[in-house]
């Protein structure tokens, strides 16, 4: 398989626990094709990133690292990768929003996703598609993001989604992506706004009164497909910004 070792990091709790069965289906594809692989299960928040770091350290050769989970799992894995020169990163989406997979036009079918990854591994390094990543800095701490990074409403909604029972309920009836819409409407009328000042490339700050949110977008959509930045591209070396301020809630 093109000289690459295949590693999987699986969040079995994604898709309200259904990802465990999805992984079994993926394994069937791997076994039929006689693929050598290693699988690691993420057991708690932040574990996927730690597993990615450990995998990068245990193999000096080029590897293919696949996240089986939602956008959160994929982002953890990305932040755990220590050497992007030797790692090919893949995603098999099993989450609620799946904005990363949607932005990359990946198959929703796990088996087809696995087959696509196996076929891509046969290609040369030059055929690898490069994706931009954003970086957020706070003091001496830095974190990468694949889809978006925001403050205000969208950040609040993401925080609520981590603990919301609504997400589990909607996932069970295959309406998981509505989680973010429900929580957005709920939060919009209760959240506090704040005055802010935005700076772009050392330009004079832009004053924003009663800011509701600001999001730096690497892909066109977030929150389960909401088109926040229709012109955004993850391969142009730029971030797009979307902000709302000064309007009545």
Model regions and ranges:
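ATP/NTP phosphate-donor binding region
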Residues: 1-65, 75, 79, 115-116
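Glycine-rich beta-strand-to-loop/alpha-helix junction loops that act as flexible
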Residues: 12, 68-70, 92-94
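Short amphipathic alpha-helical segments
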Residues: 20-22, 77-81, 102-104, 227-228
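Short, solvent-exposed amphipathic alpha-helical segments in soluble enzyme
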Residues: 23-26, 82, 162-163, 230-233
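Catalytic core of DAGKc-family lipid kinases
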Residues: 33, 83-90, 94-212
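Short glycine/serine/threonine-rich phosphate/pyrophosphate-binding segments
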Residues: 48, 72-77, 99, 131
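Internal anion-binding site segments
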Residues: 200-205, 209-249
């Amino acid at each position: 398989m093109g000289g690459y070792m295949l590693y999987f990091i699986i969040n079995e709790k994604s898709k309200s626990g259904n990802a465990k069965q999805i992984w079994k289906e993926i394994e069937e594809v791997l076994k039929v094709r006689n693929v050598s692989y290693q699988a690691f299960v993420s057991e708690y928040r932040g574990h996927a990133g730690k597993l990615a770091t450990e995998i990068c350290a245990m193999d000096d050769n080029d590897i293919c690292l696949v996240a089986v989970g939602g956008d959160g799992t994929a982002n953890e894995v990305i932040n755990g990768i220590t050497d992007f020169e030797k790692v090919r990163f893949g995603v098999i989406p099993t989450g609620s929003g799946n904005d990363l997979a949607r932005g990359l036009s990946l198959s929703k079918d796990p088996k087809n996703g696995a087959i696509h990854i196996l076929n891509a591994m046969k290609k040369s390094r030059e055929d690898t598609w490069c994706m931009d990543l954003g970086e957020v800095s706070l003091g001496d701490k830095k974190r990468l993001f694949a889809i978006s990074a925001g403050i205000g409403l969208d950040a609040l909604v993401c925080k609520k989604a981590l603990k919301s029972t609504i997400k589990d309920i909607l996932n069970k009836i295959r309406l998981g992506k509505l989680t973010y819409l429900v929580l957005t409407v709920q939060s919009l009328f209760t959240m506090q706004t704040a005055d802010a000042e935005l700076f772009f490339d050392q330009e004079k700050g832009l004053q924003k009164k009663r800011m509701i949110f600001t999001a730096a977008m690497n892909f066109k959509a977030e929150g389960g497909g909401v088109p926040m930045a229709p012109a955004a591209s993850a391969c142009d070396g730029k971030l797009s910004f979307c902000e709302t301020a000064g309007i009545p809630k």
